[in-house]
Curated annotation (Swiss-Prot):
Regulation of catalytic or functional activity: Inhibited by UTP.
Protein name according to UniProt: Uridylate kinase
Self-association and partners: Homohexamer.
Listed Pfam families: AA_kinase (PF00696)
Pathway in which this enzyme or protein is active: Pyrimidine metabolism; CTP biosynthesis via de novo pathway; UDP from UMP (UMPK route): step 1/1
InterPro entries in alphabetical order: AceGlu_kinase-like_sf, Asp/Glu/Uridylate_kinase, Uridylate_kinase, Uridylate_kinase_bac
Primary localization: cytoplasm
Length: 237
């Protein structure tokens, strides 16, 4: 069996990624492709925790005039919808999967319990962490950093629609320069938008590297866990 570099990872997938080419909702072609990739990686013996966003269903910044806490709670519920879609796709492929939510909703998912999550991972189950941190004013990127620290993940795999971190938006600027490696302070000081400052600081404090890579290219998740040099790595300087 091919060797992997990372044995326990947190994979962060944005809600927008699940929308595919749509502006809204879930593209099940994308969900099924992601599930295929996760199965391949899980079959290599990698323990996978998933954190999913909700921006394909609800974006708090569009909630003009709405109470921020209420808007954030709606966003948390959106992540649960996405988590259930991913769980279903994975289970159809024979991958045992558990959804754990930061807000209790026992009829459809387990509550987040750290020791139980780790036990699931050790048994080869994929664990999807939904509902963010369970608190308003915190992003799902921060949830990914928090869960990675709690379950002792070796790396956060930050799945994007671009193949790494650039000095400016490569979709808008043809002369954008890609970074191969960055420090946490580079990300914070240059405002590169890899993750928000809270999420980045949490990774820095706990020395959790972040690998930013292109999710739209099939096979990239496997390449990253096997140590292939793709994307941008953010780590201690």
């Amino acid at each position: 069996m091919s060797s992997v570099v990372y044995k326990r990872v947190v994979l962060k997938i944005s809600g927008e990624a699940l929308a595919g080419d749509k502006e809204f909702g879930i593209d099940f072609n994308v969900v099924n492709r992601i599930a295929d990739e996760i199965k391949e990686v899980r079959d290599l013996g990698v323990q996978i925790g998933l954190v999913v966003g909700g921006g394909n269903i609800w974006r708090g910044r569009d909630a003009v005039g709405m109470d921020r806490t209420t808007a954030d709670h709606m966003g948390m519920l959106a992540t649960v919808i996405n988590a259930l879609a991913l769980q279903d796709a994975l289970e159809q492929r024979g991958v045992p999967t558990r959804v754990q939510t930061a807000i209790e909703m026992r009829a459809i998912a387990e509550p987040y319990i750290r020791r139980r999550a780790i036990r699931h991972l050790e048994k080869g189950r994929v664990v999807i962490f939904a509902a963010g941190t369970g608190n308003p004013f915190f992003s799902t990127d921060t949830a990914a950093s928090l869960r990675a620290a709690e379950i002792d993940a070796e790396v956060i795999l930050l799945a994007k629609k671009v193949d790494g971190v650039y000095d400016k938006d490569p979709l808008k600027h043809k002369d954008a320069v890609k970074f191969k490696e960055l420090s946490y302070l580079d990300v914070l000081n240059k405002g590169l938008g890899v993750m928000d400052s809270t999420a980045t600081s949490l990774c820095m404090d706990n020395k959790i590297p972040i690998i930013v890579f292109d999710l739209t290219t099939y096979g990239n998740i496997k390449k990253v866990v096997m140590g292939n040099d793709i994307g941008t790595i953010v780590k201690e300087g």
